[in-house]
């Protein structure tokens, strides 16, 4: 995606066509390594750039987690309930969001922290039972400054009428419905 041709295509999609980009799990890893989140453009990472790294427990995790929608600034989250808690599957070994305190404060101030890992009461937490990878400030997903690029670790796409029927909680963040609505 750093090649000139791909960069031109990406620029046309995001800038000229007012498009959207979504990265879930490994897609989030790609977006953050490219700089599309948090910067909104492809640029090299610096030593202090936010990144995703190995889970704090040092191994792969696969389970259902609670995430809270912190902002619906992103078109991807327009139909999600602001402050709503969703039960989302995760499955990753390198999903821990790491950034300096200054970066995290900036992301919160800009409304770029989209979702956070929370406990059963909807409170962001560092408890590894709920924040399974040890993400700083319990951050599960972030956006570009304009919100049109969203990266998140939880698999919001893994929903359906016959999927995880024995799991309590709302599983539909309406991400794809929101994305379609954006273009209407």
Predicted region positions:
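Single conserved hydrophobic/aromatic residue that forms the stacking wall/gate
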Residues: 1-9
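The start of beta-strands in P-loop NTPase/AAA+ ATPase cores
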Residues: 5, 18-20, 150
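A structural motif corresponding to the C-terminal end of an alpha-helix
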Residues: 10-19, 144-147
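Catalytic nucleophile loop
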Residues: 14-35
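Short secondary-structure boundary/capping segments
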Residues: 35-40, 167-168
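A short alpha->loop->secondary-structure connector
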Residues: 38-48
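Amide-donor transfer/coupling interface in amidating biosynthetic enzymes
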Residues: 49-184
């Amino acid at each position: 995606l750093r090649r000139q041709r791909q960069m031109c295509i990406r620029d046309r999609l995001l800038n000229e066509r007012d498009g959207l980009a979504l990265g879930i799990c490994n897609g989030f890893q790609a977006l953050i390594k490219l700089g599309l989140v948090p910067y909104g453009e492809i640029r090299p990472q610096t030593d202090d750039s936010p990144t995703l790294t190995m889970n704090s427990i040092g191994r792969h995790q696969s389970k259902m987690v609670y995430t809270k929608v912190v902002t619906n600034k992103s078109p991807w989250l327009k139909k999600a309930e602001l402050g709503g808690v969703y039960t989302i599957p995760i499955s990753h070994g390198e999903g821990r969001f790491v950034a300096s305190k200054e970066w995290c404060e900036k992301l919160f101030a800009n409304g770029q922290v989209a979702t956070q890992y929370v406990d059963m009461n909807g409170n962001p937490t560092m408890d590894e039972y709920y924040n399974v990878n040890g993400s700083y400030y319990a951050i599960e997903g972030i956006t570009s400054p304009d919100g049109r690029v969203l990266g998140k670790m939880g698999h919001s796409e893994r929903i359906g009428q016959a999927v995880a029927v024995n799991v309590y909680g709302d599983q539909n963040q309406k991400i794809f419905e929101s994305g379609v609505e954006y273009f209407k």
